[in-house]
Amino acid sequence: FFQGSTDFGWLFPTPRQYTTSPTRMAKKGDILLSVRAPVGDMNIANADCCIGRGLAALNSKSRSDGFLFYVMKYFKQVFERRNAEGTTFGSMTKDDLHSLQVVCPEPGLLKRYDDIVSEYNKMIFTRSLENQDLIKLRDWLLPILMNGQVKIK
């Protein structure tokens, strides 16, 4: 169960809470967008999950989620500029989200984009998951190495 950007990591959220009665779901691969301050922070769901009111789950009708992710990265800059100018923007509604104007390339160009970018995104996602596993291993090993439970020869 993810409530907002507090649960976000570099690319994937970290589970801190669980629920037995989920109401709003995100599917693996959906873009999780923070719709409460700080508006615009993003992560990618690395498993099917439940989301709270502080998040929106986005995906592309054309299944070009890589393109959508980078378009939303652009909007993150727009949100940050609005915040820097002092405009109150503590939350985003469904209507606000639907009113964002996105220029969508024609399907052939979008497919070519996906053909190139999707392989790089897969590598980034795989390495990010590997890094999470290595961090867990480090956090488990370091204390037992420091207190002498395990010795390295």
Can you say where each PLM-predicted feature lies in the sequence?
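DNA target-recognition domains and sequence-specific DNA-contacting regions of bacterial/archaeal
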Residues: 1-104
